[in-house]
């Protein structure tokens, strides 16, 4: 019963559309109707930057923090409760699934990057540092958020197989690959635009 509660909490917290809520409360704008129509930090920044650059940066950062925490906090609580690695990994997948397919948004949602990074940092801190370095470098020089995220994801997956050939207790990289699949799936429109040279930059 405890595990079922943990799973439900992970999905429901993951489903909270942080960026959408913050943009509506403080920016008085519905980001699902503006810009890329995504609920993530990049769209918060892009949309609000047009009218209030300082607020845009603050809300974008706060969106990232909230999206990370909604994935990490349930894992921290569950670990204190003695949850096994298999339960924790299942919670991680459900948190990202909640963000990508939010029950509060008719099973629409964000791209899962910040929430995915948060839950993976809980298990794979070294790999996340590597991924963040890649994300920063690609983002800084190419200024394309989606490309930076996808390159960081590839770096994380590759480094996880090198640093952790077998994950503790579960002995499989399946949860990482499922999270990666969710993120890539939600990035399909971005990938299409990247291939056609039409993806927007974050200036």
Curated annotation (Swiss-Prot):
- Reaction equation(s) it catalyzes: an acyl phosphate + sn-glycerol 3-phosphate = a 1-acyl-sn-glycero-3-phosphate + phosphate
Keyword Cell inner membrane in annotation: yes
- List its EC numbers: 2.3.1.275
Task: Give, as in the UniProt entry, the pathway in which the protein acts.
Answer: Lipid metabolism; phospholipid metabolism
Entry superkingdom: Bacteria
GO biological process assignments: phospholipid biosynthetic process
Subunit: Probably interacts with PlsX.
- Protein name stated in the entry: Glycerol-3-phosphate acyltransferase
Q: Which organism is it from?
A: Campylobacter concisus (strain 13826)
The organism's taxonomic lineage, starting at the top: Bacteria, Pseudomonadati, Campylobacterota, Epsilonproteobacteria, Campylobacterales
This chain is encoded by the gene named: plsY
């Amino acid at each position: 019963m405890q595990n079922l509660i943990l799973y439900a909490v992970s999905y429901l917290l993951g489903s909270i559309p942080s960026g959408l809520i913050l943009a509506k409360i403080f920016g008085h704008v519905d980001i699902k109707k503006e810009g890329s129509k995504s609920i993530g930090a990049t769209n918060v920044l892009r949309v609000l930057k047009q009218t209030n650059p300082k607020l845009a940066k603050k809300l974008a950062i706060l969106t990232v923090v909230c999206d990370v925490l909604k994935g990490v906090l349930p894992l921290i609580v569950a670990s204190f409760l003695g949850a096994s690695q298999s339960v924790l990994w299942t919670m991680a997948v459900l948190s990202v699934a909640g963000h990508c397919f939010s029950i509060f948004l008719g099973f629409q949602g964000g791209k899962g990057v910040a929430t995915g990074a948060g839950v993976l940092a809980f298990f794979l801190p070294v790999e996340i540092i590597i991924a963040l370095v890649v994300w920063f470098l690609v983002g800084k020089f190419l200024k394309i958020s989606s490309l930076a995220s996808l390159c960081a994801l590839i770096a994380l997956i590759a480094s996880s197989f090198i640093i952790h050939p077998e994950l503790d207790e579960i002995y499989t990289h399946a949860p990482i690959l499922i999270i990666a699949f969710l993120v890539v799936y939600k990035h399909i429109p971005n990938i299409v635009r990247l291939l056609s040279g039409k993806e927007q930059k974050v200036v």
